[in-house]
């Protein structure tokens, strides 16, 4: 049987449709409905949010297909699901379920320590994490249709997402300023495919959308990432590990849309209750840092 793949233009266009919005992690139909009612543009179906994955330890895998199908049946907005890095079969299973996007995610335990998926072989568009332009360009070359900062998932700490967004944007500006003869050396030094760097130089930006993810816990966090140039926001544990998930969800959506309206953000932040409990990044051991997964 011949695989039918979606064209790059179509898949990137699907990702562009989520621009300016919030994508929320959910673990059941009830949470999915809360996210949809709050104004999420899409949801990520999981067995456990990143904070619980971090706390549980062990090996984290693709969600039970029953959960994915339950969530898909509960909402009308697009549904994403995560597969392990390099896990060909998990990705094919999710594609067969009819999910709208697959996240080849460092939040799950990698299945392959050498190869990421060839995402061009799939009809469904893929989302991938990145910390710098080298990682971003490699994922794009593999066929990713959407990027997100890795941040440090499940911590409720925005500092790593900020670092990664600033790093990528600074390197985009650097690439745009280079002559084409200088670009080959830059490609060699960063491990970024030359053809992708040429496209970035021509456009003056990444050729796919880049969302913020990994540590967004408050409306102000979401607005901050939008001001730093994010095309939208993923919220993993920040919604359903907060004291009032429905209120936090609505507030984060509003703050993402109106990220320069400080009076509104102040109003949205009043009386929300406690945000999720955060983790100081310096307390994490190297093997606990999910952002280090992927290559």
UniProtKB/Swiss-Prot annotation:
It catalyses: aldehydo-D-ribose 5-phosphate + D-glyceraldehyde 3-phosphate + L-glutamine = pyridoxal 5'-phosphate + L-glutamate + phosphate + 3 H2O + H(+). D-glyceraldehyde 3-phosphate binds at residue 166. It holds the Pfam family SOR_SNZ. The keyword ATP-binding does not apply. Its EC number is 4.3.3.6. PROSITE patterns: PDXS_SNZ_1, PDXS_SNZ_2. GO terms for molecular function: pyridoxal 5'-phosphate synthase (glutamine hydrolysing) activity. The keyword Endoplasmic reticulum does not apply. Pathway: Cofactor biosynthesis; pyridoxal 5'-phosphate biosynthesis. NCBIfam families: PRK04180.1, pyridoxal 5'-phosphate synthase lyase subunit PdxS. In the presence of PdxT, forms a dodecamer of heterodimers. Belongs to the PdxS/SNZ family. Catalyzes the formation of pyridoxal 5'-phosphate from ribose 5-phosphate (RBP), glyceraldehyde 3-phosphate (G3P) and ammonia. The ammonia is provided by the PdxT subunit. Can also use ribulose 5-phosphate and dihydroxyacetone phosphate as substrates, resulting from enzyme-catalyzed isomerization of RBP and G3P, respectively. This is Pyridoxal 5'-phosphate synthase subunit PdxS. It comes from Bacillus anthracis. The lineage of its organism: Bacteria, Bacillati, Bacillota, Bacilli, Bacillales. The gene is pdxS.
């Amino acid at each position: 049987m011949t695989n039918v793949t979606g064209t790059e233009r179509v898949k990137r266009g699907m990702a562009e449709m989520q621009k300016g919005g919030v994508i929320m992690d959910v673990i059941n139909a009830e949470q999915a409905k809360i996210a949809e009612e709050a104004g999420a543009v899409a949801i990520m179906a999981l067995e456990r949010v990143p904070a619980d994955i971090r706390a549980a330890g062990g090996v984290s895998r693709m969600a039970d297909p029953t959960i994915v199908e339950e969530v898909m049946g509960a909402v009308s907005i697009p549904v994403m699901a995560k597969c392990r890095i390099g896990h060909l079969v998990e990705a094919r299973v999710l594609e067969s379920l009819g999910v709208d996007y697959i996240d080849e995610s460092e939040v799950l335990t990698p299945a392959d320590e050498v190869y990421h998926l060839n995402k061009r072989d799939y009809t469904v568009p893929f989302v991938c994490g990145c910390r710098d332009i080298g990682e971003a360009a490699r994922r794009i070359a593999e066929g990713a249709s959407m990027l997100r900062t890795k941040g440090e998932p499940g911590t409720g700490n925005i500092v790593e997402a900020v670092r990664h967004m600033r790093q990528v944007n600074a390197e985009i500006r650097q690439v745009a300023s280079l002559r084409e003869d200088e670009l080959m050396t830059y490609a060699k030094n960063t491990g970024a495919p030359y053809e992708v760097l040429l496209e970035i130089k021509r456009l003056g930006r990444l050729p796919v959308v880049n969302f913020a993810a990994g540590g967004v816990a408050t409306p102000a966090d979401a607005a901050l990432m939008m001001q730093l140039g994010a095309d939208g926001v993923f919220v993993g544990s920040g919604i359903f590990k907060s004291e009032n998930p429905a209120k936090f969800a609505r507030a984060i959506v509003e703050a993402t849309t109106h990220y320069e309206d400080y009076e509104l953000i102040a109003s949205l932040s009043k009386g929300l209750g406690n945000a999720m409990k955060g983790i100081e990044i310096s307390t994490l051991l190297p093997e606990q840092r999910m952002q280090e997964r992927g290559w």
